[in-house]
A protein has these predicted regions:
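Acidic, low-complexity/disordered tracts enriched in E/D and polar residues
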Residues: 1-68, 129-132
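Long, charge-rich, low-complexity alpha-helical segments
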Residues: 3-9, 55-140, 166
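Basic phosphate/pyrophosphate-binding loop/patch that engages nucleotide-derived ligands
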Residues: 10-19, 257, 284-285, 308-314
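Canonical Radical SAM [4Fe-4S] cluster-binding loop centered on the CxxxCxxC motif
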Residues: 130-168, 179, 360
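Radical SAM/AdoMet-radical enzyme domain recognition
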Residues: 155, 166-187, 194-300
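C-terminal accessory region of radical SAM enzymes
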Residues: 304-332, 355-384
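Short, small/polar residue-rich loop motifs at catalytic or cofactor-binding pockets
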Residues: 341-345
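Short, acidic, Ser/Thr-enriched surface-loop or helix-capping motifs
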Residues: 350-351
Length: 384
C-alpha cells in the first residue's frame, strides 16, 4: 500500500528543474553550417540559449530542457525517452515536441538580421519579473566623451573623469562571461571615439557574448568602418538619429545595407514631435525594421504614445530597454531617476571608470566591476 501511495504521489509531483549552470556545445567541424551554443539554466528551470554568440533566446522550462538535451548531444530518441519519463507524456509526443524545438532553433540559426534578443514561447515581460542568477545584459559606457563640436555638458563628464584601458575592459568582459552574462552593449558618450572598439568587440565575440554598439557617430556612414566592426563580431547596432543631419541618415542607410540587426533611436522634443510622422515615413523608406523612442522634454513625452502607434501602423517594431548614449539628442538633464523594472536585475550599467549602476541615469553605485568581487556587486543590486 505504501508503495502504491508513493507511486501516486510521484506521478503528481512537479518536475524538478535541471541543475542551474552554464553548458556549451560546438557543432562538428564537418557540419554543413557550423554553429555554437551556450545555455544558461536558471534555478527555476527556465534558461537562455545563445546562438553563435549573436542571439539570446529566452526559454521556458520545457524549451530549456530540450536545449539542455541538445547541447548534451542526445539523439532525438534519447531526448524523447528522457522527456517522456520526466514529464510523464507519450514518447511519440515528446519526440514531436523535441524535434519541433530543434527545427525552430535551426531556422533561427539560418536567419540573418535576427533580433538579438528573442523570447521563445515566453511572454517578453516574464523574465524581468523573477529572480535570476545573473543579469542578461551588461551596458558598458566606454567613454563619456562626445564628438568635436558637441557641448560636453550633455554627458556627465564632471562626475566621471577617468576611462578604463582596453585591458581593463577585457577583464570586465571576462568577469561578466564567467558570471553568466551573455550580452554586452557598448555605449557612451560616443563609443566610436575609442579606437579600441573593434578589439573589444572581438574579445566579446571570442568569449561567446552577444555584442551590440549604440552610437550616433557619422563614422557609421562609412561602409569600410562598419565592415571593420562587423568583421570584429558586432551583432547588432542602434543608430542614434539626428533627423536634421544628412550624415546621420547616411549612417542609417549604410547600416541597413549591411548584414546587421539595426535599430534606429529617435529622442523626441517639441520640434521633432511635430515632424514625427514624416520622419517615420523616411525611416520606412529606408527599410528600417526596429525603432526606439524616448523624449527629452514634456512636449515630446506627450507625443510618445501617438508616435508609437503611428510607427506600428508603418510596420516598425518598437525596441525597449536599451540605454541611449548621452549626446546633444539625449541630454543628461532629461534622464529619469526612478529605475525601471529590469534595472539591477535584467541588466547593469558600467560607467567609463568601471563603477556599476543599476541602469543608466540611476546614480547609485553598486561597486566597481573591475576591482570589486562580482558577488558583492550582485548582492547590492538585489537589495536595491
Amino acid at each position: 500500500m505504501a508503495s502504491l501511495i508513493r507511486k501516486i504521489r510521484n506521478r503528481f509531483q512537479p518536475v524538478a528543474p535541471l541543475p542551474a549552470g552554464m553548458h556549451h556545445y560546438q557543432s562538428p567541424p564537418d557540419a554543413p553550417a557550423p554553429y555554437r551554443l551556450h545555455l544558461r539554466l536558471e534555478p527555476d528551470g527556465t534558461g537562455i540559449l545563445i546562438l553563435n554568440a549573436s542571439t539570446v533566446l529566452h526559454l521556458n522550462p520545457t524549451a530549456a530542457e530540450c536545449a539542455y538535451l541538445w547541447v548534451k548531444d542526445s539523439t532525438p530518441d534519447q531526448a524523447a525517452k528522457t522527456i517522456a519519463s520526466r514529464y510523464r507524456v507519450d514518447r511519440k509526443q515528446a519526440l514531436r515536441d523535441y524535434t519541433d524545438f530543434i527545427q525552430r532553433v535551426e531556422t533561427l540559426l539560418r536567419t540573418t538580421d535576427l533580433d538579438p534578443v528573442t523570447f521563445l514561447d515566453f511572454d517578453r515581460h516574464d523574465p524581468y519579473s523573477k529572480e535570476i542568477s545573473a543579469p542578461y545584459r551588461l551596458d558598458c559606457a566606454l567613454t563619456y566623451r562626445l564628438p568635436e563640436g558637441e557641448n560636453v555638458h550633455y554627458a556627465p563628464t564632471e562626475r566621471v573623469k577617468n576611462e578604463l584601458t582596453a585591458d581593463d575592459w577585457e577583464k570586465i568582459l571576462d568577469k561578466a562571461w564567467a558570471a553568466g552574462i551573455p550580452h554586452v552593449v557598448f555605449t557612451g558618450g560616443e563609443p566610436v571615439l575609442r579606437d579600441d572598439l573593434p578589439a573589444l568587440i572581438a574579445h566579446a565575440e571570442k568569449n561567446g557574448q552577444v555584442c551590440g554598439v549604440l552610437s550616433g557617430s557619422p563614422r557609421l556612414g562609412s561602409a569600410d568602418y562598419l565592415k571593420t566592426l562587423l568583421d570584429s563580431g558586432l551583432d547588432h547596432l542602434m543608430v542614434l538619429l539626428n533627423p536634421d543631419r544628412e550624415e546621420s541618415w547616411a549612417a542609417v542607410k549604410t547600416a541597413m545595407q549591411a548584414d546587421l540587426a539595426t535599430t534606429v533611436h529617435l529622442t523626441l522634443n517639441a520640434d521633432l514631435a511635430a515632424r514625427g510622422e514624416s520622419i517615420l515615413d523616411r525611416l520606412r523608406q529606408a527599410e528600417v525594421k526596429w525603432l526606439s523612442l524616448s523624449a527629452s522634454d514634456a512636449d515630446g513625452a506627450k507625443c510618445l504614445v501617438t508616435l508609437r502607434d503611428r510607427a506600428a501602423d508603418r510596420g516598425l517594431s518598437l525596441q525597449w530597454d536599451l540605454p541611449v548614449p548621452y549626446s546633444s539628442a539625449n541630454p543628461v538633464s532629461q534622464e529619469i531617476g526612478a529605475p525601471s523594472s529590469g534595472a539591477g536585475k535584467a541588466w547593469l550599467y558600467v560607467e567609463p571608470d568601471g563603477d556599476v549602476l543599476p541602469e543608466q541615469g540611476v546614480n547609485r553605485v553598486l561597486g566597481n566591476f573591475l576591482s570589486d568581487p562580482w558577488e558583492t556587486i550582485r548582492e547590492k543590486a538585489r537589495t536595491k
